[in-house]
Amino acid sequence: MAAESLPFSFGTLSSWELEAWYEDLQEVLSSDENGGTYVSPPGNEEEESKIFTTLDPASLAWLTEEEPEPAEVTSTSQSPHSPDSSQSSLAQEEEEEDQGRTRKRKQSGHSPARAGKQRMKEKEQENERKVAQLAEENERLKQEIERLTREVEATRRALIDRMVNLHQA
């Protein structure tokens, strides 16, 4: 079985993009409240043996910034007259909370992933400014070194001439 190639090469991604993708991946993997299993830190062998479960489409709606379709939400809920009504009411409350969070994220226009990407972008820009400042300082220091080198050479020549003149006199 051959592995598929990636649609991009790693060389084309900047460090802040990779960091933002990593943060997004960590958020998805650790989302215990959305129906996925919690990814435990290394060393917990019991948790490592569990298989990561797939999240339902309603809980992933915030990723695509689309509202879940009513058919998806109502198909997962049970009628209040069923024997499991206490469990279904809890599930409905959790779904309503998830939908409320989705709406809040849409209204505010800022998701944790976007905030992380924005921080990374700002950090990248700050690093670029620092690089420019350091390059400027480096150039200034090179010019200073050249000036001091010329001064040392002139002093050395003057000292040699003086020594030669002392021996001749």
UniProtKB/Swiss-Prot annotation:
Protein name (database record): DNA damage-inducible transcript 3 protein
SMART domains: BRLZ (SM00338)
Top-level taxon of the source organism: Eukaryota
Role this protein plays: Multifunctional transcription factor in endoplasmic reticulum (ER) stress response. Plays an essential role in the response to a wide variety of cell stresses and induces cell cycle arrest and apoptosis in response to ER stress. Plays a dual role both as an inhibitor of CCAAT/enhancer-binding protein (C/EBP) function and as an activator of other genes. Acts as a dominant-negative regulator of C/EBP-induced transcription: dimerizes with members of the C/EBP family, impairs their association with C/EBP binding sites in the promoter regions, and inhibits the expression of C/EBP regulated genes.
Organism the protein comes from: Homo sapiens (Human)
GO cellular component: CHOP-ATF3 complex; CHOP-ATF4 complex; CHOP-C/EBP complex; chromatin; cytoplasm; cytosol; late endosome; nucleus
Record PTM: Ubiquitinated, leading to its degradation by the proteasome.
Record-listed Phosphoserine modification sites: 14-15, 30-31, 79, 82
Annotated region described as N-terminal, given as residue ranges: 10-26
Region (Interaction with TRIB3): 10-18
An annotated GO BP: negative regulation of myoblast differentiation
Domain bZIP: 99-162
Region annotation (Basic motif) ranges: 101-130
Disease: Myxoid liposarcoma: A soft tissue tumor that tends to occur in the limbs (especially the thigh) of patients ranging in age from 35 to 55 years. It is defined by the presence of a hypocellular spindle cell proliferation set in a myxoid background, often with mucin pooling. Lipoblasts tend to be small and often monovacuolated and to cluster around vessels or at the periphery of the lesion.
Places the protein is found: Cytoplasm; Nucleus
Subunit structure: Heterodimer. Interacts with TCF7L2/TCF4, EP300/P300, HDAC1, HDAC5 and HDAC6. Interacts with TRIB3 which blocks its association with EP300/P300. Interacts with FOXO3, CEBPB and ATF4.
Molecular function GO labels: cAMP response element binding protein binding; DNA binding; DNA-binding transcription activator activity, RNA polymerase II-specific; DNA-binding transcription factor activity; DNA-binding transcription factor activity, RNA polymerase II-specific; identical protein binding; leucine zipper domain binding; protein heterodimerization activity
Basic and acidic residues bias locations: 119-139
InterPro entries: bZIP, DNA_damage_induc_transcript_3
Induction remarks: Up-regulated by oxidative stress, amino-acid deprivation, hypoxia and endoplasmic reticulum stress. During ER stress, induced by a EIF2AK3/ATF4 pathway and/or ERN1/ATF6 pathway. Expression is suppressed by TLR-TRIF signaling pathway during prolonged ER stress.
Domain remarks: The N-terminal region is necessary for its proteasomal degradation, transcriptional activity and interaction with EP300/P300.
Region of interest (Leucine-zipper), residue spans: 134-148
